[in-house]
């Protein structure tokens, strides 16, 4: 089993604030079915969980239905305004996954999950963080020496319909000047 956990708030905020510079339109958001398909290529069944902040008492019904149609299990969490309910929910889920066999893929850039990720890396399972590597927390990046994989949601997963306006470090061996001319 591979557990796919999506920090919906974090992915949306990083895409909007750091990559696009504005709130993403539906066409600019990741194609979640591609993310799930990418993870399924690991060759084991996927349990896909999508964490949502529902603290305002609202649930985006059409989005929830779309997630369910793509075989994601929406997990709408609520709490006090100052509580990071999505982070708490993901932390608890990662702790629970540590008690059972299975790989883990987390879509987030957030350092709040470092203790749980570190614990998961100690028993030989495959663990990855998917996102925009240039925005992944340096504390998460430090776990690559323990075996954590960092996977680019755009270039490796192919989760977007059009190229994003990203500025990132390009290894010289990968540099092609044509797109810049």
Regions found by a protein language model. Give the residues of each.
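Nuclease catalytic cores that cleave nucleic-acid phosphodiester bonds
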Residues: 56-181
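Domain-level signal for Mg2+-assisted phosphodiester chemistry and nucleotide/NA-binding surfaces
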Residues: 1-84, 126
